[in-house]
Design a protein with these regions (language model features):
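N-terminal cap/lid subdomain of alpha/beta-hydrolase-fold enzymes
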Residues: 57-163, 449
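A catalytic-pocket lid/entrance helix-loop region that shapes and gates access to the active site
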Residues: 107-111, 208, 212-307
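Alpha/beta-hydrolase fold nucleophile elbow
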Residues: 187-199
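Catalytic histidine-centered segment of alpha/beta-hydrolase-like enzymes
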Residues: 467-478
Length: 502
């Protein structure tokens, strides 16, 4: 029988949304047990709403969170405050935390098949690979995602959206929220980690610096899952430069290999034997060729196009028509057009879709996102209400209204380097799926290379690739490996008995 404890910390303060009221400072606790890696684990799940305070101490928003804390027998000398804690964010911007919550590290996950495709009837199952045996986990929904909302003042006016919806505003208020959470839960002595998926990668790069310099909270690790680096993804004129454009090719090659669109010679070898050759070609030949623009010789253009075709499965003439610079949307439309009459997914290019016509320059829809939305959405709503016992009539925003999003002054990559330079203990782990076309794995490698141009901290960076897409943890083999990789990263970033110095 689950023990349920409901605590209303601020009974009179309410958050208002479409005439639906929920307490802004609430905790619901339920007790559970599960099996992780063959070991029985007892844990408490705490769901709730915790306010974001302004400088005058007034609540301006309340964030929905789920906090999983492992319980130990009294006869075991386990000090909770010394146990690692991981704070988890998804991306968007505007996405709730459901994806990694019920897809990756949490103790309960979505029912999916071994290759990571959701199966009906949709529901939840035990996650035997969850990192809860090693670390406590907090899943946080930023403002306007999940159940998180802005709070009106006494006059009924909502706060200025600029306080929340932008790269730097997002980092600033979330850092204050994390400080409040760590203080309330008495976790200042715990080794601390932040993990972010997709745009969450940008978020946690920035948080590493903000937490250290504004909240005096030093981290053991930053984990980037399929990270979105806006230095690569955003362009004033919509045109990529030679480097950014070229970084797509290794992903194109991996995807073409998966769909068996390459020569028999390549299809006969393993993906990980093949990709280093493509990466070398990209760095040493493709980038210099595209950098020459219209002044490249016809001979070199033809040679590069032939190699590009060999590695990507695209026709040489198609590549030449695009001036060796293939946009990712064109690749998703073109790769299977002639052979199968199908498109491929953006976030997970193992998915295939059917367009209204074979003609066109880009797919009609993101077929993989449609699949995920109609499987994750009912699962998270049912799980939170029926297993975690958090009840509200407010809508769970899988994707919430956060736009326009201020992308100015993005210094997150530089600030991660500063945070690492300030903190000799801080390590960074990057996880990417080879079939992710939105934030591809080679872009993630490039970001890793560029964070510290001096190379003096390169031994504190770790990278792992997985044979899946954006949510690389959906495939069962990768769910196991990626969680094990997180355990190893936590172990390797332990600093017990070590002085914080170079």
């Amino acid at each position: 029988m689950k023990k349920i404890l409901l605590i209303f910390l601020l009974n009179t303060s309410m958050i208002f949304s479409q005439n639906i009221h929920v307490p802004i400072d609430t905790i619901v606790k339920t007790n559970h047990e599960t099996i992780i890696k063959g070991e029985k684990i007892k844990y408490t799940a705490e769901t709730g709403m915790q306010p974001v305070w302004d400088k005058d101490g007034n609540p301006i928003a309340s964030l929905f969170y789920t906090y999983y804390k492992r319980n130990f027998s009294k006869d075991l000398d386990k000090k909770e405050s010394h146990r690692p804690i991981i704070i988890s964010f998804n991306g968007g911007p505007g996405s709730g935390s459901l994806w990694m919550h019920i897809g990756y590290t949490g103790p309960r996950v979505l029912k999916i098949d071994d290759e990571g495709f959701p199966i009906q009837p949709y529901g939840m199952k035990t996650n035997p690979y969850s990192i809860l045996d090693t670390a406590d986990i907090v899943f946080v929904c930023p403002v306007n995602t999940g159940y998180s909302r802005m709070i009106p003042d006494k006059n009924g006016d909502l706060p200025d959206r600029k306080k929340f919806f932008g790269i730097n505003a997002d980092i600033k208020y979330l850092a204050t929220w994390i400080n409040t959470f760590i203080t309330r839960k008495n976790r200042w002595e715990s080794p601390k980690y932040i993990i972010g998926e997709s745009y969450g990668g940008t978020r946690v790069m920035g948080l590493s610096h903000e937490l250290q310099n504004s909240q005096w909270m030093y981290l053991n690790g930053v984990i980037l899952v399929s990270p979105a680096d806006y230095k690569l993804l955003e362009f004033d004129d919509g045109q990529e430069d030679a480097i950014d454009s070229s970084l797509h090719l290794p992903y194109y090659a991996a995807t073409a290999w998966y769909h068996k669109m390459l020569d028999k010679e390549i299809q006969s070898i393993d993906l990980l034997e093949f990709l280093p050759k493509v990466e070398e070609f990209t760095i040493n030949e493709l980038i210099p060729a595209i950098a020459k623009g219209g002044f490249i010789s016809d001979i070199e253009r033809n040679e590069i196009a032939e190699k590009y075709s060999y590695y990507s499965g695209l026709d040489k003439d198609f590549i030449i028509d695009y001036n060796l610079d293939i946009p990712n949307y064109a690749f998703w439309k073109e790769l299977l057009r002639k052979r199968d009459g199908l498109t491929i997914g953006r976030l997970d290019s193992r998915y295939r879709g059917i367009d209204r016509t074979n003609a066109g320059s880009r797919p009609d829809t993101n077929i993989e996102l449609n699949s995920w939305n109609h499987s994750f959405t009912p699962a998270i709503n049912h799980y939170v209400r029926n297993e975690l016992k958090f009840e509200t009539d407010i809508k769970y925003n899988v994707f919430g209204p956060v736009h326009p999003w201020n992308k100015e002054n993005d210094n997150t990559r530089k600030n991660l380097r500063k945070a690492m330079a300030q903190n000799p203990f801080l390590k960074v782990f990057i996880q990417s799926g080879y079939y992710d076309g939105a934030t591809n794995y080679f872009q993630a490698k490039y970001t890793m290379w560029q964070v510290d141009p001096s190379g003096k901290m390169k031994d504190r960076f770790y990278f792992e690739g997985y044979r899946s897409g954006h949510m690389m943890y959906l495939r069962n083999e990768d769910l196991k490996k990626s969680n094990d990789d997180l355990r190893e990263f936590i172990k390797n970033s332990s600093t017990n008995g070590m002085p914080a110095k170079y």
